[in-house]
From Swiss-Prot:
GO terms for biological process: negative regulation of myotube differentiation; regulation of striated muscle tissue development; translation. It comes from Homo sapiens. It comes from the Eukaryota. Residues 1-31 have a biased composition (Basic residues). This is Ribosomal protein uL3-like. One of its GO terms (molecular function) is RNA binding. Changing A51T: In CMD2D; uncertain significance. Keywords: Cardiomyopathy, Disease variant, Ribonucleoprotein, Ribosomal protein.
Amino acid sequence: MSHRKFSAPRHGHLGFLPHKRSHRHRGKVKTWPRDDPSQPVHLTAFLGYKAGMTHTLREVHRPGLKISKREEVEAVTIVETPPLVVVGVVGYVATPRGLRSFKTIFAEHLSDECRRRFYKDWHKSKKKAFTKACKRWRDTDGKKQLQKDFAAMKKYCKVIRVIVHTQMKLLPFRQKKAHIMEIQLNGGTVAEKVAWAQARLEKQVPVHSVFSQSEVIDVIAVTKGRGVKGVTSRWHTKKLPRKTHKGLRKVACIGAWHPARVGCSIARAGQKGYHHRTELNKKIFRIGRGPHMEDGKLVKNNASTSYDVTAKSITPLGGFPHYGEVNNDFVMLKGCIAGTKKRVITLRKSLLVHHSRQAVENIELKFIDTTSKFGHGRFQTAQEKRAFMGPQKKHLEKETPETSGDL
């Protein structure tokens, strides 16, 4: 019998305890990037929805590496990011105990998909949310008070954040209730931030005004839920030998006799997945525009490159599984991210200043795969499939409609 190594590193990370279900569905930003007044005023985060994954082909441009100027096939994630709507401004003052909310000002008109978030049952409610806040914009006294509030923000506040919500009507979901989030404004003075937010109330903010091509960002989301799992699946502990009594996928020793209790560091069965996680340094491969009009023509070739000039959309044949079509702006991120399909994803500007070759590398894609994700796809576009497979019966019926003869 061979020698057994009696010392081994523990299984599982203790830095994320307790492994329980997250009480929030949307990723929360707990730390914002450091403010730089020398930069123009800008948002520091954005909201999107995970659509699915595909792969790309590109040429690596990192001087000094052996793989430089070689082609690489890399997996990417598509996050659909319709424009956000600014509906409010929040000012924070600095106190000895941290930041405290000073003033909150909402816009005059709020859409129903935003107001639905404040009701548990929208259908049975009286739908009177924000009626008093909206009246302030209409009478003379209310307008004067609003100007005083904006002036007080400029005078006393240290941090300015805007309240934004997503547009569910632009997405292929049944859900009508929008996701609402506070996003911090960085850059410029406090007066410039308040003026920026005041000028964009009830207006849309696109994703390309927040992030840029080849930028490194952070992704905050809730992971895919996997229910109650055993200790082997949850903590990746070693399976016991075959002849072990009463099961193999267990932990044989759960601690000493004394202290007479099971310690918190002992691997146990329980909830796996649906945890709040922040993943740093995700590279943006492309920020694509949805279908739009240019010179009177509808442009949908947001998956074309300088090498692959085929007019094709980022949506693969048959759509993304369990999601559908991507008909809005999108962000293409390198690798995988947390969450399942249709999960709301929080994209935040990176907290760090990056100087590595990999972080500052300019991304130039040669090819983006748009084959069907339901099986072993081989065709990039529907036209390519039709040219190879031949016309279907429905296409022939459209071209030569049958003429009914007189009886």
